[in-house]
Design a protein with these regions (language model features):
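Structural microenvironment flanking redox-active thiols in thiol-disulfide oxidoreductases
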Residues: 23-72, 78-81
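Residue-level structural signal for beta-strand termini and adjacent loop
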Residues: 3-5, 85, 117
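Structural micro-motif
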Residues: 67-70, 85-91, 95-103
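Short active-site neighborhood of thiol/selenol oxidoreductases, capturing the structured segment around
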Residues: 2-30
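Thiol-/selenol-based redox modules, centered on thioredoxin-like
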Residues: 94-135
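Extracellular/periplasmic catalytic domains that process cell-envelope and extracellular macromolecules
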Residues: 4-7, 39-40, 64-65, 96
Length: 135
């Protein structure tokens, strides 16, 4: 849960279309999980999908580059609705699925950066640059 990190870590949230968004979303999820800059004592990256957990357990078992990815399952879409990501430009399924959207939340729980990316590019370096402004 996001609240587990409150007061402890800066958090990157990556809302995405999940299993159907191959390869772009899978690649970003893997990059966030495998990039040591996002997995430190001060920071964590969480990928948020609306797919069922068992579906992703199967995907991760076959795609070892995803094993370090921290995945949150938003099957009810309550987090996606709360962060208002279901109707942004990057969503290919407006109203029902998030697209390719990032949030940086500081240790105090304040959203410090938001980026919706219809191009679905890998964003690690851009996110790190934004996170460095929090220090």
């Amino acid at each position: 849960k996001l609240s587990d990190y409150l007061g402890k870590k800066n958090v990157v949230l990556f809302f995405n279309e999940g299993s159907m968004c191959y390869p772009a979303c899978w690649n970003q999820m893997a990059e966030l999980g495998n990039d040591s800059r996002f997995n430190t004592e001060n920071m964590v990256a969480l990928s948020i999908v609306t797919d069922p957990k068992d579906q992703w357990l199967d995907i991760v078992s076959k795609s070892t580059n995803l094993t370090k990815s921290k995945i949150i399952f938003d099957t009810s879409r309550s987090a996606s609705k709360a962060y208002d990501v279901l109707n942004l430009n990057s969503s290919m399924h407006r109203g029902s699925l998030p697209g390719h959207t990032y949030f940086i939340i500081d240790k105090e729980g304040v959203i410090r950066f938001t980026m919706d990316d219809p191009n679905m590019a890998l964003a690690n370096d851009k996110l790190i640059k934004e996170i460095e402004t929090l220090k």
